[in-house]
Amino acid sequence: MILLKLYLTLAAILCQSRGTTSLDLDDLMTTNPEIQNEIINKHNDLRRTVDPPAKNMLKMSWDNTIAESAKRAALRCNQNEHTPVSGRTIGGVVCGENYFMSSNLRTWSFGIQSWFDERNYFKFGFGPTRAGVMVGHYTQVVWYKSYKMGCAINLCPNEPLKYFLVCQYCPGGNVVGRKYEPYAIGEPCAACPNNCDNGL
């Protein structure tokens, strides 16, 4: 009986440890090509699932110059306001910007999914479905014309939400007058039928 209790206790501990992931800041550095691929693939996978479907959604790709700009933004540790436009204009193009902040270290996929999940409070062509909710991160993730991006992470020890993830998107989305129509509705790839990769 004692052996059975010991076995069940050990089994419970092992199961719990499988459910938790031990992350280190170095594991999430965007200089790592595997992390770059995770970020790009997550964005493209989510862009393929927009509802209503998009006929003109471009495929995202990684850009090291944009990643350097995102790194400068992350190093500022200013979680209260976005980088000034002059600080995220690259090659004459104004880029958009998303932040994710957390007291615990989270994967890039987790942060990107949290931006996308703002769609639960978004109605295409209308905007937020209730007062006080954010949808701008979602609309930037799915902005049809944004096709280059770069991201960076930083530890901001003096902030309560000390882990700071920043992505920048070029050209930027959330254009005034079109903010709540981040793409054109239609059959995927209808606007670019000869240059399509699984809906993008």
Swiss-Prot record:
Q: Which Pfam families match?
A: CAP
Report the SS bond pairs: C77-C156, C95-C170, C151-C167, C189-C196
Residue ranges constituting the SCP domain according to the UniProt record: 41-169
Q: Where in the cell is it found?
A: Secreted
InterPro entries membership: Allrgn_V5/Tpx1_CS (IPR018244), CAP_dom (IPR014044), CAP_sf (IPR035940), CRISP-related (IPR001283), SCP_CRISP (IPR034117)
State the signal peptide span: 1-22
Q: In which tissues is it expressed?
A: Expressed by the venom gland.
| Record's comment on post-translational modification | Contains 8 disulfide bonds.
Which GO terms of the molecular function aspect are on file? calcium channel regulator activity; potassium channel regulator activity; toxin activity
Tell me which UniProt keywords the record has, alphabetically.
Calcium channel impairing toxin, Disulfide bond, Ion channel impairing toxin, Neurotoxin, Potassium channel impairing toxin, Secreted, Signal, Toxin
Q: Which CDD domains match?
A: CAP_CRISP
Q: Does the keyword Nucleotide-binding apply?
A: no
This protein's GO cellular component annotations are: extracellular region
Q: Which Gene3D superfamilies match?
A: CAP (3.40.33.10)
Q: What does this protein do?
A: Blocks ryanodine receptors, and potassium channels.
Its family remark reads: Belongs to the CRISP family.
Q: What is this protein called?
A: Cysteine-rich venom protein VAR8
**Originating species:** Varanus acanthurus
Organism placement in taxonomy: Eukaryota, Metazoa, Chordata, Craniata, Vertebrata
